[in-house]
């Protein structure tokens, strides 16, 4: 198999990267009706598998789970999750032959094996679904030509997909039809019904492509969503302790700080996050963000280039073949960092204190979001996709750090995201430690920024620069579709 994207000519590549259309709510008037009465079999019962299945069943669809015989015989976690929630569970041989839609929600590295196992069992003219297009785009998997191949990709962890649905809402979602596999022209109807069944149509759906979803998803998770949070956590904690701060306080400021400051992103973008600061602190955060961009800009664009070329996926798949040697080594090293082992702090940190004492962290968020967004757009990815894969998902990932620090983040995200995170953070961490940390001033981290005289013209120009960045302009439009977003921060 060959990387599918690399088999396309330039015109086709640009067309696929640029597929992005925000769908009207009226297009989902039929909701999930197209799939009602059809048999849907989900392969895999992890976070996405279980929670999408719960939503789809509650939307009136016929859902069952196909698991490997050993998972059933040994009553593994996937079997327990499915049966405890009242789902029918069976082997591939028992369930796949009668399925109208088979949804593959296993980890990326298992996709080729799953395809090889289920494809011979699937009935003629059925459909096959993904929630991430890596197997199609990067691995180059070729699906039987009579089978319709679609994607529904919620832009949230599986737990959030369920919680938002229970509130009568949903999470923003990308949908796509693989252009090589739509023999009956029903792909979009299937994808729309699936997205509606998960509740995604209530938060906004982008009609995208497998290519655009994969390339933007990989870029976001490697850089701002995971890599920047990991690198920032490590260097900020080390700096606080080196400055004599209580290690327990430093740990809590970082652990819950990302979540608290990015909650402002969710409600009002970078503009609101920066508005939580005093004028003196805002100007300093802006200055620091520009310095961080100068230091890390090349790394963001390198990751984007390696994702577009297929170099990243080839490197990671080589590690798969080597038993995940690098992944496991990097995971172990992360567990040994000082931040991961910081003592618990029982004191209270107010919401505003996270902003006042975290100016450097805010600068890292601003710089990281803008760099990731700009790199994606410069590579042909549309602004809507770039927004969802940078700013929108950041509060959700920050929330995982608030639970159990970097360990929880790396458990919740996919192995693909975790591998890319380490590639980025392993390079970004020493750069930040060498080029940014030594030049910090009093009030950049761990204590409030001292008040200084603020020039009206300077403040006006900085505010204009913040508010007029393209990620802010498209973000304001897209957040209009998500007016019922819940508050997720739990910091205390």
Swiss-Prot record:
It comes from the Bacteria. PANTHER family: KETOL-ACID REDUCTOISOMERASE, MITOCHONDRIAL. The active site is at 132. Mg(2+) 2 binds at residues 217, 389, 393. Pathway: Amino-acid biosynthesis; L-isoleucine biosynthesis; L-isoleucine from 2-oxobutanoate: step 2/4; Amino-acid biosynthesis; L-valine biosynthesis; L-valine from pyruvate: step 2/4. This is Ketol-acid reductoisomerase (NADP(+)). It catalyses: (2R)-2,3-dihydroxy-3-methylbutanoate + NADP(+) = (2S)-2-acetolactate + NADPH + H(+); (2R,3R)-2,3-dihydroxy-3-methylpentanoate + NADP(+) = (S)-2-ethyl-2-hydroxy-3-oxobutanoate + NADPH + H(+). GO terms for cellular component: cytosol. The gene is ilvC. Its EC number is 1.1.1.86.
């Amino acid at each position: 198999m060959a990387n599918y994207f690399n088999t396309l000519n330039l015109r086709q590549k640009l067309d696929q990267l640029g597929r992005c259309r925000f769908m009207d709510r009226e297009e989902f008037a039929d909701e999930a009706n197209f799939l009602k009465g059809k048999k849907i079999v989900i392969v895999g019962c992890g976070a996405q598998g279980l929670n999408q299945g719960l939503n789809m069943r509650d939307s009136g669809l016929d859902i069952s789970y196909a698991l490997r015989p050993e998972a059933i015989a040994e009553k593994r976690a996937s079997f327990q999750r499915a049966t405890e929630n009242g789902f029918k569970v069976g082997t591939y041989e028992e369930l796949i032959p009668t399925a109208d839609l088979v949804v593959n929600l296993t980890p990326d590295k298992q996709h080729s094996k799953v395809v090889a196992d289920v494809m011979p069992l699937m009935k003629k003219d059925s459909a096959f679904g993904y929630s991430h297009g890596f197997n199609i785009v990067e691995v180059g998997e070729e699906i039987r030509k009579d089978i319709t191949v679609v994607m529904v990709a919620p832009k949230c962890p599986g737990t959030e997909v369920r919680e938002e649905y229970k509130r009568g809402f949903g999470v923003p979602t990308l949908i796509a039809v693989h252009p090589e596999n739509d023999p009956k022209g029903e792909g979009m109807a299937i994808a729309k019904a699936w997205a509606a069944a998960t509740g995604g149509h209530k938060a906004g759906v982008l009609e995208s492509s497998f290519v655009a979803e994969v390339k933007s998803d990989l870029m976001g998770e490697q850089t701002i969503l995971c890599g920047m949070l990991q690198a920032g956590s490590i260097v900020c904690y080390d700096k606080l302790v080196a400055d004599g701060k209580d290690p327990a306080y430093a740990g809590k400021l970082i652990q819950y700080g990302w979540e608290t400051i990015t909650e402002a992103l969710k409600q009002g973008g970078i503009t609101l996050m920066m508005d939580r600061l005093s004028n003196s602190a805002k100007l300093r955060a802006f200055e620091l963000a520009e310095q961080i961009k100068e230091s890390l800009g090349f790394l963001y664009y390198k990751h984007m280039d390696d994702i577009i070329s297929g170099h990243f996926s080839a490197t990671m798949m080589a590690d798969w073949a080597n038993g995940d040697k690098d992944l496991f080594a990097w995971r172990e090293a992360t567990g040994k960092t000082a931040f991961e082992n910081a003592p618990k702090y029982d004191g209270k940190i107010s919401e505003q204190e996270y902003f006042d004492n975290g100016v450097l962290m805010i600068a890292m968020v601003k710089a990281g979001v803008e760099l990731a967004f700009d790199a994606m757009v410069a590579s042909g990815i549309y602004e809507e996709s770039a927004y969802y894969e940078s700013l929108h998902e950041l509060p959700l990932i920050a929330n995982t750090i608030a639970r159990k620090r970097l360990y929880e983040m790396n458990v919740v995200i996919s192995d693909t995201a975790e591998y890319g995170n380490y590639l980025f953070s392993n390079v970004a961490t020493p750069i930040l430690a060498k080029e940014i940390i030594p030049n910090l001033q009093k009030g950049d981290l761990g204590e409030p920024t001292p008040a200084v005289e603020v020039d009206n013209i300077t403040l006006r120009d900085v505010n204009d620069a913040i508010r007029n960045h393209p990620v802010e302009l498209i973000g304001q439009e897209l957040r209009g579709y998500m007016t019922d977003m819940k508050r997720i921060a739990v910091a205390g």
